[in-house]
Amino acid sequence: MDINYERPDPYYLLNKIDKEEKNKNRGKLKIFFGYAAGVGKTYAMLRAAHYMKELGKDIVIGYIEPHARMDTMSLTKGLPQIPVKNIDYKGVILREFDVDKALLRKPEIILVDELAHTNAKSQRNKKRWKDIEELLDAGIDVYTTLNVQHIESLNDIVANITHVSVRETIPDKVFDDADKVELIDIEPDELLKRFTDGKIYRKEQVKRAFNNFFTKNNLYALREIALRRTADRVNFEIEIARLSKGQITVMATSDQILACIGTSPSSARIIRTAARMAESYHSKWIALYVDTGRSLGKADKETLNANFNLVELLGGELVTVHGENVADQIIRYAELRNTTKIVIGKNHKRTGTLLHFYAKDVVDKLMDSNSYIDVYMIPNSSYYRDHKNSILSKISIQHKGSVKDVLKAIIIMAITTDIAELFSYMGFKDVNVIMIFILGVIIVYMATKGQIMGIISSIAAVLVFNYRFTEPKNSFIVYDKSYLVTFPIMMIVAFIIGSLTNKVQKEAQDSNMREKRTQTLYIVSGKLLSAVGTSEVVSIGIKYISRLVNRNVICYLADTSNKLSTPFVYKKDKGAKEEIIMSKDENAAAYWTFLNGKESGCGTSTFYRAKGYYIPIKIKNKVLGVIGVSCPSGPLRPQKKAVVDTVTGQIAIALDREILSKEQEKSKVEIERERLRSNLLRSISHDLRSPLAGIKGAASTILENGELIDEKRKQELINGIYEDTEWLIRLIENLLSMTKFDEGNTKIKKDVELVEEVVSEAVQRSSKYFKNHKIKVSVPEDVIMVSMDGSLIEQVIINLLDNASKFSPKGSTIEIKVYEKKKDVVFEIIDEGQGISEDILPNIFDRFFTNGSKISDSRRGVGLGLAICKSIVEAHGGKIEAVNKGSGGAIFKFNIPKEL
């Protein structure tokens, strides 16, 4: 974590700018906030309204909940009121706020009681807070009231305390975004007196409410929650104001504890102390580790990881910063986070050593440079034992030179000696030769890992210089006593410069690593944003997790039955073993994480023997799946855990976006389906009426006047009944076909069919309907065989013929043309009608789409025939289209693949 203390915090600065931009032309929201009904929220709101009226403000009442307290209701007098809506709901008259009248009236300030209220179903918005959003967007200031149990994030907490579940809630963001929150607070004893006097509820409701909600313990708990929630909001506002200006001086509005930890085992004591203090003060706590860039041995790394895990276990926030001056970094970060208390270990000094007589430890420096943050010192009597073990660990493990490093050092020092010999031969003085050796030592530091080779090279450089370049040469004897000073200085200078070089090199490597990690996280964030589909989101996510932590990664997603589906796996290399999915234990760990929404596996206390580390893909308290990372060589380091957590969080957001997208699509489909149902009922009611009326009229004429009607007229009436009945049958067939396609129940039963026979059968079945038109059929002489569902293709041809007959003049010709084109068979139905308007061509195959022009048989049609044709043709893998003929009329053509 890299922090720039010299400039405003971008997060808080953006928050401030965003709020200012958002509120530029927007109304202001003021919430009168309380911990229970009866504390006086509405009373305080009405008092404030009268005060604003005295100042000359245009203020009106939008809605006030009727109260039992007469002194509250009396305050409504003298304030103009917008009439409420009276809505009849199942015989009960409901009074609702009329947002449209309020927007039309557009006062400066409006009073709307009960922010969390749920509107009646006939209202435009489901929730009253959405009505208030409309008022704010229109530039109207709003006063409203709210109880603590109606805030969404506190709903469960309040329910656990009171055993009463409140359904009417508002999002936390509505409360947090309010411009002002005024806490209305009274003592619980006074509230209980109001309650028993019947000033809050009617007498008949008092007993039931007293037994369930209005108990003294409940009211004290609710009061504390309300006070704390208000304090949290004020604290966040202070943070925005403070850090957006780059001001990092501590403003102790609430307690926050900073635990300073390191590689010492005694840091565990500091962590536990900070956690206990945070619990006592009801405050947050942060564990801070300052990475000075020094190399850590294996034991130090293990201890540090154990300390990091303890922080997570005890619920603290873990932060790592980088810097050489530990005390300075602690003070700066404490100021940045508005910390009021620092907990740090204090090392016992050994008075017998000169070093400790002059040296100041971190605690002393903190005390000297800080006068406004409390520092709590935890004695660390085991410091020297820990420090000794740390040094031994670094010498034995961290700085162990490899054979490759030894060879590098020997070669570099050999070359350095040869160059020094050359300089000496050319007459250069000893000081120049010494510089050559120092340069060689620096190169050794740069070329090898750790410091052991550099230290050995420093000693070797002094010995070689003494042996080869001082009198007597080729001997370790020194005649000139000044060299006794030169040699140690030469060795110390070489060591210091080499160490600094090594440190700079390590810092550069760390910086590059952090930069690479940040860049990768930025890339994965962009890719996840642009990913389409669950599979792509997961594939991108686990791929980049694997790259960042250099491990195999697995991802399980929840299926529709709320179980884990077949996993996605990404291996860091093709030959890597998939050990994280090979055993039942691993699956059990992943499933436990899925069910409980908590991490498990290697490095945790649950399924700790597992070979993988499992973390839930979680958003809004819903677990969408599980990410698993293989741990063949031990638990992940905290830095890598943080990376996995970050990318997993991004995956969760992307998956949630996909779920929302699918739900929106599903909602659109449902809305469209409802619209189609409405259109269908409207169309059918019109289209059934005409033929049924005709059938009824003809039948009644025959029944009542059968003997008086001549045979010819009677036959005409019977034919009319028959034709209308056939038309109704075709309509019902089309409706059934479309319903089957919608439900996915239509099965295409393909058989090899003779095209000529299918066309002939369709013409024969429909010829009696088209007596006023000539049907012409043109098929190739060669036999054409196609794999298709013959009965469905017949229905397509009949529907197209029916459509052509409706829009063609009597006596005109309708032609059916069939021909082969590449791998398809093309069917064309050509009429001599008026053609199709260019405006309706794109929609002609849509359901319930009908041409508004008058048709030949005066029947409007439901608008399903062409839609069914499209569904059938596409189910066969073909396409259907309509075009206009140049000489008048239209051509409907569709193709079917010939494959047998």
From Swiss-Prot:
Keywords: ATP-binding, Cell membrane, Kinase, Membrane, Nucleotide-binding, Phosphoprotein, Transferase, Transmembrane, Transmembrane helix, Two-component regulatory system. Residues 683-900 form the Histidine kinase domain. The gene is kdpD. This is Sensor protein KdpD. It catalyses: ATP + protein L-histidine = ADP + protein N-phospho-L-histidine. It is found in: Cell membrane. The keyword tRNA processing does not apply. Its EC number is 2.7.13.3. In the central section; belongs to the universal stress protein A family. It is a multi-pass membrane protein. The modification Phosphohistidine is found at residue 686. The keyword Kinase applies. PANTHER family: SENSOR PROTEIN KDPD (PTHR45569:SF1). One of its GO terms (cellular component) is plasma membrane. Member of the two-component regulatory system KdpD/KdpE involved in the regulation of the kdp operon. KdpD may function as a membrane-associated protein kinase that phosphorylates KdpE in response to environmental signals. The chain crosses the membrane at residues 406-426, 436-456, 482-502, 522-542. One of its GO terms (molecular function) is phosphorelay sensor kinase activity.
